[in-house]
From Swiss-Prot:
Record-given protein name: Ferredoxin-1
Cofactor mode of binding and number, as noted: Binds 1 [3Fe-4S] cluster. Binds 1 [4Fe-4S] cluster.
Record's keyword terms, sorted: 3Fe-4S, 4Fe-4S, Electron transport, Iron, Iron-sulfur, Metal-binding, Repeat, Transport
Known cofactor(s): [3Fe-4S] cluster; [4Fe-4S] cluster
Binding site for [3Fe-4S] cluster: 12, 18, 52
Pfam families the UniProt entry points to: Fer4_10 (PF13237)
Domain 4Fe-4S ferredoxin-type: 3-32, 33-62
InterPro entries: 4Fe4S_Fe-S-bd, 4Fe4S_Fe_S_CS, Fe-S_Ferredoxin
């Protein structure tokens, strides 16, 4: 089982909260937006979804 991590770049404000909260470093900021560069490491904990005030992140089980 894996997880699909999606960031809506139109909603993303680039505050980096998801980068800071993710326990397995799925995200990094690129050009002021969060990018799930290590999606295969995602644990599905949804901490990133909880801290994203813009509602830009979705995490779905494959």
């Amino acid at each position: 089982m894996g997880w699909t991590v999606t960031v809506d770049t139109d909603k993303c404000t680039g505050d980096g909260e998801c980068v800071d909260v993710c326990p397995v470093e799925v995200y990094e900021l690129q050009d002021g937006k969060a990018v799930p560069v290590n999606e295969e490491e995602c644990l599905g904990c949804e901490s990133c979804v909880e801290v994203c005030e813009a509602g830009a992140i979705t995490v779905e089980e494959n």
